[in-house]
Amino acid sequence: MHRYFIAHLIALVIILVLMPETKKVQARQNAQSPKPAAASSPNLEGVWEGPLDVGAMKLRLAFKVTKAADGALAAKFRSLDQSADELTVDVVSLKESAVHFELQRLAVVFDGEVNQAGSEITGQFKKGGVSFPLTLKRVAKPTTLNRPQEPKPPYPYDAEEVSYENKRDGIKLAGTLTLPRGKTSVPAVILITGSGAQNRNEELMGHKPFLVLADYLTRQGIAVLRVDDRGVGGSTGSVPDSTSENFAADVMAGIEFLKKHQGINPKQIGLIGHSEGGLIAPMVAAQSNDVAFIVMLAGPGLPGEEILYLQGALILKANGASDEVLARQHASQEKIFTLLKQEKDIAVVEKRLREEFDKQMANASESAKAQGQQALEAQLKQVLSPWFRYFLTYDPRVALAKVKCPVLALNGENDLQVPVTENLREIEATLKTAGNKDVTTVRLPKLNHLFQTSETGSPDEYGKIEETLAPTALKMMGDWILKHTHSQQ
């Protein structure tokens, strides 16, 4: 959300299901692109762009290469569908036609060959041991990301840089509190990000959803606290060793902070959680009487395992996977998930997963096996993490049944990560059966998991869509919160 659940969805599925097919494509590309016998090094200066196919989506990558007066090469890297930020390439080299880029902090290496025309670089993009074919083409005009909803200063409200402590876990949390100017005792919300380490703006795919949401709500007279996740920005701690329970404790600390702020009405503090954040919000509301309301944005209503089955099939189907691939994926997921649930010893789980990998790759080529082995090492860390094991078996209905405050649950009809029908149905049924009389669930047409207006809902579209948050979703949240805090303007 949002890394959402995608990273975990493809954790071993890419290896066990898609990797052999990917390797075949790579082999065909290599056969069609023989290594040129370059007499001298071509000109590498300029902008090079190309799509990286990682199975569940395609990410557009860009390298901008410059040359100093002394001939030294330098480069900047951008993942166009993930962030607008440029990152410095640590190592840039060109020897005859061989190109080498390294981004050490991201564990990224690209090795390629420039064609004789100097218009294309064909090679391998490696990230943390996983290798994918990548073809970069020289472009005259770099691709720019247009994000028209991102607010620009000056703002008609106040913004405070804040920090506070989660005393239970010894974590310092840092964020931004936006406050309606010239008002006191205003309602407030805490924004809760989706899975993975994200900054206070929930920045992903070149979008900053929580920045846009905070700006909109604060203009409506609602204070908004958005916070860096553990280990991100100004916050301490670590995400890999944490579970949703730990993140819920972080939110509880945020509530205590807001209760003491002189500009906030302590009886009108609510939570807005996106994706996994929509799982955490009910956890907190079930424990604390200080939560006045919650908004679940694509929040789960089913156990993690069930969501991953649905999610995996929908995303692969949207990307053109055959029924055979879908069946193989489900079977592989089922084996992995059953093992994770039944075996508590991590060492035993790892051993069994390696054996399963060897079995699945038995008929693959030697080169495919080598590539798959690299991917296995990188992805094992994810499925063996405390977070994944917790998420797999956690049933959000247990906490939902204890939530007594008003609830607004929104899902996009094109959401392929937290499918709308199954999850909204369970959320509504659980809350109402438990006696909650103020429950609103809404299906929003054409909106995806990020609440963007979309064509298919595939994660492949996220970064390509200019809209960050659909105005219909923003207005629905703002109106509902104002109604429930009696603060209509």
List the predicted regions and their residue ranges.
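Central antiparallel beta-sheet cores of small beta-barrel/beta-sandwich binding domains
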Residues: 34-128, 149, 156, 162, ...
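Primarily recognizes the serine-hydrolase "nucleophile elbow" in alpha/beta-hydrolase
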Residues: 253-323
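Short substrate-entry loop that stabilizes the transition state in hydrolases
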Residues: 184-186, 195-225, 304, 416-417
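Alpha/beta-hydrolase active-site loop
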Residues: 209, 241-262
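Accessory cap/linker subdomain of secreted extracellular hydrolases
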Residues: 295-402
